[in-house]
Swiss-Prot record:
Gene Ontology cellular component annotations, sorted alphabetically: ribonucleoprotein complex; ribosome
Keyword field contains Ribonucleoprotein: yes
Keyword field: Ribonucleoprotein, Ribosomal protein, RNA-binding, rRNA-binding, tRNA-binding
Any one biological process term the GO annotation gives: translation
Name assigned to this protein: Large ribosomal subunit protein uL5
Subunit (UniProt): Part of the 50S ribosomal subunit; part of the 5S rRNA/L5/L18/L25 subcomplex. Contacts the 5S rRNA and the P site tRNA. Forms a bridge to the 30S subunit in the 70S ribosome.
Source superkingdom: Bacteria
Organism name: Rhizobium leguminosarum bv. trifolii (strain WSM2304)
Family of the protein in this entry: Belongs to the universal ribosomal protein uL5 family.
A family per Pfam: Ribosomal_L5
């Protein structure tokens, strides 16, 4: 007997329900024109990296726990004396999620992490870039269940960019609404 291949819940929902809803709403001429999620980029900038060079490594470990994938340590491109930053100094971490990990992260973000954000009133519907990509920020990384609150010595914020194949912001907004993104009214 062949093993059933694992498929994330949101990907299954996209194939079965969301594609049909998008086709009805925008009436695309071709099935390949229906927008889909391309990738999710999570960036964690560590401002305290100038004082302690171990901070980006700790942030990268937390980001690896959240994303389920090893992040890349980002380095300064050039020196800025005002910020006490030298060229090639580690200043943060980032990770790009695609495929099954992307859908799993999106599921945890929308259903678990965002409701745990303090004073959360919804995502800003104007945070689209004009080409169908959505960017948001989270001030505390402890809203994710993968982070043990007792072991955290410092809280970091993170930028989350959801890249879609949509050509306009309206298409991307409709796609993300179908994925249950809680946009502000």
């Amino acid at each position: 007997m062949a093993e059933a291949k694992y498929e994330p819940r949101l990907k299954k929902e996209y194939v079965e329900r969301i594609r049909k809803a998008m086709q009805e709403q925008f009436s695309y001429a071709n099935e390949m024109m229906i927008p889909k999620l391309d990738k999710i980029v999570i960036n964690m900038g560590v401002g305290e990296a100038t004082a302690d060079s171990k901070k980006p490594t700790v942030a990268a470990a937390d980001l690896a726990a959240i994303a389920g994938q090893k992040p890349v340590i980002t380095r300064a491109r050039n020196s800025i004396a005002g910020f006490k930053v030298r060229e090639q100094m580690p200043i943060g971490a980032k990770v790009t999620l695609r495929g099954a990990r992307m859908y799993e992260f999106l599921d945890r973000l929308v259903n678990i992490a965002l409701p745990r954000v303090r004073d959360f009133r919804g995502l800003n519907p104007k945070s689209f870039d004009g080409r169908g990509n959505f960017a948001m920020g989270i001030k505390e990384h402890i809203v994710f269940l993968e982070i043990n609150y007792d072991k955290v010595d410092q809280m970091w914020g993170m930028d989350i960019i959801v890249c879609t194949t949509a050509t306009t912001d309206d298409e991307a907004r409709a796609l993300l609404k179908e994925f249950s993104f809680p946009f502000r009214q």
